């Protein structure tokens, strides 16, 4: 399928997607009933969309195009109420978190969807292993060239986004020692990590043509890069965050990305170059492994800085942009989080360290989501 022309969209508008866990009490393992829930809510959603993701234990909540985080929060809140009621009617529960702490990938059923079934044929068991749960944020762009500039700019802050959203310390019944283990699942995919270097939209079109020759890539949705342009929507999509445990944190993360995008495209402080990516995977690893305690290295100067310090600097830089687009509340909340030194991964570990079980952890996450 050829790459569509870049659809011009209003700059800095938002679209947010949350991949949620569908769980089956009282054992709190993943359920295989997302299709049933989607059928139950499809005529009750007035704004946004509830839809499938890769496997039957995943439920995606997606906003419409939103002006700001307040509009997105309102849409999510309304969807949340409908989904929670449908889940209760079917004796199911819903929660966030980047991974389910003890599910077995072998039990996961891929959705009866043509694209997902084709992906299963291409990637085999890797698709079942990809039963992990992330937050994706789309930001509107006025042109393809702006999208490429924004993609490179946001890529500088991938470690910051990962560290702030880290919520997947447990996997397959084990403490992984990572703050965010979810991104590791995609390491075997041939398109894992950053997009190959291009400097403008014309070069991106040539890159996509080359990738399509592999027969594995039919559309932009078949690419699993950390950040990717989405020409159909006219956006850049950031895909590195774990799904948070609360809607409020999800909205705050979206506000962070929206404000960072506004700052990048209005200030244009960076002259991007391929060398910017020289230490990308090392810095990304630090964020996944250690969260805000990780240390990132500047590929140009060799300077090293903790992610705590780097994130506080970012929040300070983008504060004026956040004020202009109505995202100041998000930046203030994230600042408090960084100063406190806590993220959701650490809260999960604290629960288990205090005698909680992994079953109890999922139950608590469901209570958090339902009680917000």
From Swiss-Prot:
It catalyses: L-cysteine + L-glutamate + ATP = gamma-L-glutamyl-L-cysteine + ADP + phosphate + H(+). GO terms for biological process: modified amino acid biosynthetic process. Its EC number is 6.3.2.2. It holds the Pfam family GCS2. Keywords: ATP-binding, Ligase, Nucleotide-binding. GO terms for molecular function: ATP binding; glutamate-cysteine ligase activity. InterPro entries: GCL_type2/YbdK_subfam (IPR050141), GCS2 (IPR006336), Gln_synth/guanido_kin_cat_dom (IPR014746), YbdK (IPR011793). Gene3D superfamilies: 3.30.590.20. It is an enzyme of class 6 (ligase). Belongs to the glutamate--cysteine ligase type 2 family. YbdK subfamily. ATP-dependent carboxylate-amine ligase which exhibits weak glutamate--cysteine ligase activity. Homodimer. PANTHER family: GLUTAMATE--CYSTEINE LIGASE 2-RELATED. This is Putative glutamate--cysteine ligase 2. It comes from Escherichia coli O127:H6 (strain E2348/69 / EPEC).
């Amino acid at each position: 399928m050829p790459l569509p022309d870049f659809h011009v969209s209003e700059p800095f508008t938002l679209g947010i997607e949350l991949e949620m866990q569908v769980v089956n009490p009282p054992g709190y393992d993943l359920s295989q009933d997302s299709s049933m829930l989607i059928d139950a809510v499809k005529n009750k959603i007035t704004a946004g969309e509830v839809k499938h993701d890769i496997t039957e234990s995943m439920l995606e909540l997606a906003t419409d195009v939103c002006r700001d985080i307040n509009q997105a929060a309102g849409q999510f809140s309304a969807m949340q109420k409908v989904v929670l009621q449908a889940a209760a009617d079917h004796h199911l529960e819903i929660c966030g978190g980047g991974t389910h702490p003890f599910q077995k990938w072998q039990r996961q059923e891929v959705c009866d969807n043509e694209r997902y079934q084709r992906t299963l044929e291409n990637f085999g068991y890797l698709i079942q292993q990809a039963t992990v749960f992330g937050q994706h944020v789309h930001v509107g762009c006025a042109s393809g060239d702006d999208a490429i500039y924004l993609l490179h700019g946001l890529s500088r802050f991938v470690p910051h986004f990962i560290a702030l959203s880290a919520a997947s310390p447990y996997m397959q019944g084990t403490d992984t020692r990572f703050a965010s283990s979810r991104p590791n699942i995609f390491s075997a995919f041939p398109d894992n990590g950053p997009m190959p270097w291009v400097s403008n939209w014309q070069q991106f079109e040539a890159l996509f043509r080359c990738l399509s020759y592999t027969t594995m890539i039919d559309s932009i949705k078949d690419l699993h890069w950390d950040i990717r342009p989405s020409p159909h929507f006219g956006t850049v999509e950031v895909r590195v965050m774990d799904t948070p445990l609360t809607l409020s944190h999800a909205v705050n993360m979206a506000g962070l990305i929206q404000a960072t995008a506004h700052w990048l495209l209005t200030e244009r402080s960076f002259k991007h170059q391929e060398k910017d990516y020289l230490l990308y995977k090392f810095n990304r690893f630090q964020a996944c492994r250690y969260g805000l305690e990780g240390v990132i290295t500047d590929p140009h100067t060799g300077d090293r800085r903790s992610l705590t310090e780097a994130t506080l600097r970012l929040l300070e830089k983008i504060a004026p942009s956040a004020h202009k687009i109505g995202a100041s509340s998000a930046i203030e909340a994230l600042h408090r989080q960084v100063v406190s030194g806590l993220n959701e991964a650490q809260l999960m570990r604290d629960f288990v360290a205090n005698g909680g079980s992994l079953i109890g952890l999922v139950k608590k996450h469901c209570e958090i989501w339902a009680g917000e």
